From Swiss-Prot:
This is Large ribosomal subunit protein bL9. GO terms for molecular function: rRNA binding; structural constituent of ribosome. It comes from Pseudoalteromonas translucida (strain TAC 125). Belongs to the bacterial ribosomal protein bL9 family. The gene is rplI. Binds to the 23S rRNA. The keyword Ligase does not apply. PROSITE patterns: RIBOSOMAL_L9. One of its GO terms (biological process) is translation. One of its GO terms (cellular component) is ribosome. The keyword Lyase does not apply. Keywords: Ribonucleoprotein, Ribosomal protein, RNA-binding, rRNA-binding. It comes from the Bacteria.
Amino acid sequence: MQVILLDKIANLGGLGDQVVVKSGFARNFLFPQGKAVPATKANIETFDARRAELEAKIADQLVAAQARADKLEALAEVTLVSKAGDEGKLFGSIGTRDIADAISAVGVEVAKSEVRLPLGTIRETGEFDVSIAVHSEVTATIKVIVIAEA
């Protein structure tokens, strides 16, 4: 199915690209989320008329994401307290939700889907660098310090 993308989508394309995708992906994901429209003549003409408006909207989103990333970088570090054994092994683990909640408690709203843990959940005490993907093009790195509960 031929579609016109209304947003940048990883591994697919950017604004205005006409791509061929499977019809189920288009009907179940792209169309409901407003990320694409079918590539009909009428939609192509409508898109060409709205292109500047959509590009301005995406630029505004990028500026807002950069501002959030700057706030996150200003935080520098977040400390989490968890129960741990003698050798620093945690009883349980610290995942994306725990990190997102801790950052949000400090004052910068972060969704758990934005937190990137490349090595999986944190299972020991120490300092860890965690990436926060605030936008597809903007990421911020924050230091997470995990200490044992006294």
